[in-house]
């Protein structure tokens, strides 16, 4: 069911806000080391300012402690709190009867060159001031202390920047004021742990039509994992495919023990030139605990510190995924990983995502942009950071993982070149997608 608020900003600008479920069917079962799903229920936000419609989406995987913290009901709870904040702020504004309005929604980003134009006073331009107003209500929402607020803020912020970009006829990466990198970044397609090898091969066939950069999900079963990698390679060779594998990312989804990591190291090191990274081999609990009174196991932590060096010595890089939510997590991760996978739902959106990327680079960590299982709306938003600030590209394949019938948007913010590299579409405004007719 759609929930909605309508109001008049400064008695001049019509604004409509709404939230609804965005149900997605997957092309193949999407399996990781901790879950298998065939459908997803994401949240879709729409913010309409006069005749300009901005859209935002947050991907909502099955909940997992310390990592995936929100479901649709949580997003709806947050949305209701946000519109309550808007209602209260509106009443204050009416009492004060101030004509001008200004709020710097980007003041937490220390480098002032980012979002430079959107920080300014709008001098009576109410159609832009309303976005500043909605950002202020978002930043002051009483639910921001809740762990599920990050995914909620991500979707709302996305819709705000989509609408603002459409109004200014600019794509988001130009709003951010980041140039498109001269070196194009790779697009990875995820081959998940489907229930059967036939489904894994079907996924391989589908993904390899788009890119030679493949992300393969594995669990703690080393023999099975290496069989999957071997089978994927043979599949492309035996099909006489014109596509060769450029790079493979191995994603353990926090499922390995130190012993398993060392067994995989033996098997993966001979193909180190092919492996771009190993994602999240260690448990999330290596650096975090569900119970705040519980202490970190220092011996366990030190073992993973050693494994980082062992992998490095064999030419393999370890990246964090589940363990990195916001920039606050970065300092502790430096000892464990060579890089981090940044996802907008976990950071809280593009603004904190940008801050997290910048801090990661300051700490000497490599960067990668990931996405949840989501439509092209969501992954296109992430592409605006990937195009310039990701060292290793990313797995922006969410739009390919879902079937066409449940995809509400078209015309991605980026195009895939024949070699699997991403090129931004500079003529697509806002996030860069359009609603299907």
Swiss-Prot record:
Active site residues of this protein: 217 (proton acceptor), 395 (proton donor)
Biological process (GO), any one = peptide metabolic process
Matching InterPro entries: DgoD-like (IPR034593), Enolase-like_C_sf (IPR036849), Enolase-like_N (IPR029017), Enolase_C-like (IPR029065)
Q: Any idea of its EC number?
A: 5.-.-.-
- One term of GO molecular function: racemase and epimerase activity
Keywords (alphabetical) are: Isomerase, Manganese, Metal-binding
Q: Does the keyword Transcription apply?
A: no
Where Mn(2+) is bound, by residue? 251, 279, 321
Pfam families in the record, alphabetically? MR_MLE_C (PF13378)
The entry sums up its family as follows: Belongs to the mandelate racemase/muconate lactonizing enzyme family.
Name this polypeptide is given: Enolase superfamily member DDB_G0284701
Task: Give the species this sequence originates from.
Answer: Dictyostelium discoideum
């Amino acid at each position: 069911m759609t929930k909605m608020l309508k109001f008049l900003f400064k008695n001049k600008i019509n604004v409509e806000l709404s939230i609804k479920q965005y149900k997605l069917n997957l092309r193949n079962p999407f399996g990781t080391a901790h879950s298998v799903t065939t459908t997803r229920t994401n949240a879709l936000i729409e913010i309409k300012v006069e005749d300009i419609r901005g859209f935002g989406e947050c991907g909502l995987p099955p909940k997992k402690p310390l990592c995936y913290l929100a479901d649709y009901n949580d997003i709806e709870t947050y949305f209701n709190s946000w519109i309550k904040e808007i209602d209260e702020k509106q009443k204050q504004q009416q009492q004060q009867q101030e004509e001008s309005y200004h709020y710097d929604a980007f003041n937490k980003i220390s480098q002032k060159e980012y979002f430079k134009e959107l920080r300014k006073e709008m001098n009576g331009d109410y159609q832009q001031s309303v976005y500043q107003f909605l950002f202020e209500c978002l930043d002051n929402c009483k639910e921001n202390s809740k762990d599920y607020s990050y995914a909620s803020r991500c979707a709302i912020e996305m819709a705000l920047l989509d609408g603002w970009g459409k109004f200014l006829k600019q794509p988001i990466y130009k709003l951010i004021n980041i140039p498109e990198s001269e070196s194009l970044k790779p697009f990875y397609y995820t081959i998940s742990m489907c229930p059967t090898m036939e489904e894994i091969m079907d996924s391989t066939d589908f993904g390899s039509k788009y890119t030679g950069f493949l992300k393969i999900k594995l669990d703690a079963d080393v023999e099975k994992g290496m069989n999957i990698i071997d089978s994927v390679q043979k599949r492309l060779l035996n099909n006489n495919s014109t596509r060769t594998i450029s790079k493979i990312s191995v994603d353990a989804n926090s499922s390995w023990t130190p012993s398993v990591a060392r067994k995989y190291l033996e098997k993966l090191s001979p193909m180190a030139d092919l492996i771009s990274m190993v994602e999240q081999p260690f448990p999330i609990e290596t650096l975090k605990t569900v119970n705040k009174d519980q202490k970190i196991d220092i011996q366990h932590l030190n073992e993973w510190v050693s494994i980082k060096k062992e992998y490095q010595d064999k030419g393999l890089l370890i990246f964090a995924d589940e363990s990195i939510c916001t920039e606050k997590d970065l300092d502790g991760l430096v000892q464990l990983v060579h890089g981090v996978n940044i996802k907008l739902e976990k950071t809280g959106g593009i603004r904190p995502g940008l801050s997290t990327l910048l801090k990661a680079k300051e700490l000497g960590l490599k960067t990668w942009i990931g996405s949840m299982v989501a439509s092209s709306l969501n992954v296109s938003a992430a592409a605006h950071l990937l195009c310039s600030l990701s060292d290793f590209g990313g797995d922006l394949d969410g739009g390919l993982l879902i079937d066409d019938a449940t995809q509400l948007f078209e015309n991605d913010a980026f195009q895939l070149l024949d070699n699997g590299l991403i090129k931004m579409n500079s003529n697509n405004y806002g996030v860069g997608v359009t609603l299907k007719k």
